[in-house]
Amino acid sequence: MTEIKKPDVQSYHPNMGSDPLKLEKGWCHFSHEGIKDFLDYITAFEKQPDGVSFEVRTFRGAKALVNITFVSETAFRFQMFPHMAEPRLLNQVFDFSPAGAPVVKEEELFITAKTARLKLCFRKCPWEMTVELDGETLTREQIKDHNVDQKYKAVPVGFTVGDDGTVINAFETMYMYADEAFYGFGEKFNSFNKRGKFVTVWQRDAQSTNSDISYKGMPYFMSSAGYSVLMNTFTRTHFNMGATSGVSYTMETEDPYLDYYMFCNRDPKGLIRDYTALSGRSAMIPKWAFGFWMSRMSYMCRAELEEIVEKMADFGMSVDVIHIDAWQPNFEDSFVPSGVEELLSFDERRFPDPQGMIDSLKEKGIKLSLWMFPYVQAIDPEGRISNQFRTMSDRGWLVKGPDGKPRVFSPGEGDVDAWKVAALDFTNPGLVDYMKSRIKRLMRMGVGVMKTDFSEELPEDSVFFDGTTGLESHNKYPLLYAKTIYEASREAKEEMGEKALLWGRSGYAGSQNYPANWAGDSSASKNNLHSLLTGGLNIGLSGVSFWGFDIGGFYNCDYSGQRVIPEDEEYIRSVQMGLMSPLSRSHGQSTPREPWVYSETAQKAFLKINKLRYRMLPYLYSTGWETVREGIPMMRSMLLEYPDDPNTRNISTQYMLGGSLLVAPVFDQPKHHVYLPEGSWIDLETGARIDGNRWITYPKQIDVIPLFLRENSMIPMLKEAPLHIEDKNFEDLELVVNIKDHMEQAYCDDGVEGIFRADLRDSILNLTVQDIPVSRFRIYAAGVVEQVFINDTAAAFTTDGSFLTV
């Protein structure tokens, strides 16, 4: 390394060098007590083929190694190794390939590393990293957040040393702009903008969807300043996003080193594209998955299942999937002599001839979804040990404890009196092969999808086959579980020329590679819908697109704690938002969610939005392909589509479904306020044109969810709603268009990439259609239309109030 002259350090710390131990006090935003240390000044640096390395002296006289690696021209990796020590385990989520050598220069006060667009400036003394994008400062580390006594309120980038001298955590502290906002962190339900919040990423069985305890926390967030950060670890992470200081935020990992990626792009869509280009994008899911899923916990036998299918047909609803939770032998069956030993088999006493049942469902246009969890029942309340536990333990396929025996624990948060389970070890290749073979068997029978439930509660003292601990792999476990089941499903489905998906509860950074997800156990209450939407928006900004929630709410209790069906309005509002979400599954805990058990008003409201969704399937599927190509979520926060509008930065009560449709679900608000960004919008309920760039008060109607068509955009729709989705390209479409002057929009179907253009000028409307099977247009024009041309050929049209039919 090239050595750098030692600076006069004392001048930078006039009040701290004499009493450094005072740095320990008052740091409530850190999770560990101990001696804090931080990077002080550079002593040497060395150019690397893909970045630059630094030897840095710390405040307490130790040394640290800092490696900077560029992974694209606008993204880099920051690694800090205290005491110059390589860790026992680099517990990384991703190891992105380097993108080539930056230009590294030494200047009088700085070392700089530069790509075509990104420049990192490292101050020699005191250590400080500044990030510039296209010649302008984007962000920088915070090195001077002090109290009046000149003691640090937020300590600069550094680490904590325990009593035995080992490093027990590491942290980064960044400057926070006065108006900076933060989004993401996975499926966090409690707030949209995380400024001023504490966030911990540690998967838990949340048992609700209205707090920041979540099934799918992710150590990834996006800043309104034009960058995003992924803490590149599976270990528990903590984020103090300005909760204890209005000028700094801190990221902490319980690793003995620091490892994160920073992506730089002033366009929030660009940030998601950049992140998913490296971390992965979802493969396309089956077309039928965009239909309606019917479920309850649970249909208990084949006769009941087939009765529900018959009732759905009689009711006239459009539906494509039915789900069974309790399809396997009862848990008790594994505790009797000669009881069940293998996993994932039908209980043929309750579901006789499962192959015949699946074939019968297929003939009726219905796919089958089945529940699973990644545990085996170990010990029942009477202390008996299950046959499955013995079998899996004998094969060495269970996660162990410190004593080398299978680690037994309660499967849910706080379930101390529940049946005890042991976890399948997805780091063991033997177990992975076994589970894949069991899943492939089900897929080849014709099962459509597996619901991968649970996986969040592995204890920290667990020991895995690959040698990692519960601290290191607790967050990784849900991802390994999803990966195993998804890969098995995909491999089997590809043999049959079909697409695959999961219906997964838990996950982590990178979950978009194993679609899809649902929000977990949600309440039926109307105000809880807002929490669900917040979770959906946050996980979308974290790279996950194919997402839904339990329509009707998974649970609902009366004042005595008894389970009851939701009230009509609770059910209706949930149905409306759920059917205008990326994926739509109705599900409930023991009480029914079938629409016919509710009032006539609720039934009509259900059918109205159910049929509208099915008419919109070409739009939804095309938007799904946009996710696959670009990583942009289907359910989009308003700031994604309108990043330059400051009004959108904190809106979490509405969203864009794709780029054309604004959805403003009704919760429990006394008055329903909707923000319409710039342009003029078409109210799809009334056909009225409404000027934007303002808030409006929308009249609440029980059968209406406000939907608005964006200016200069279109929605491809089916003319009639089918009962089921066929596995073929959509045909005979109607394009619903809101045109002011000029627009161009892509359309995608399997193997089809079409383009639609519209130009309105001097009362002449020119429509250009390429590779879109359209037979009718419904045109909402902002001006007078006297002539219409389609692909340069004059076309007849009629006027019906607010729109033209062509």
Label the model's feature ranges.
Residues 81-83, 90-93, 134, 318-606, ...:
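Aromatic- and carboxylate-enriched substrate-binding clefts and catalytic-loop regions
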Residues 64, 109, 127, 216, ...:
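Residues that flank catalytic or metal-binding motifs in active/ligand-binding sites
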Residues 295-297, 305, 311-314, 320, ...:
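C-terminal substrate/ligand-recognition segments
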Residues 1-283, 287-288, 297, 302-310, ...:
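N-terminal accessory segment at the very beginning of proteins
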Residues 75-76, 119, 128, 219-220, ...:
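Beta-sheet entry/capping signal
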Residues 486-492, 500, 507-517, 539-549, ...:
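Catalytic core of carbohydrate-active enzymes
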Residues 185, 195-198, 214, 305-306, ...:
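Short, hydrophobic/amphipathic alpha-helical packing segments
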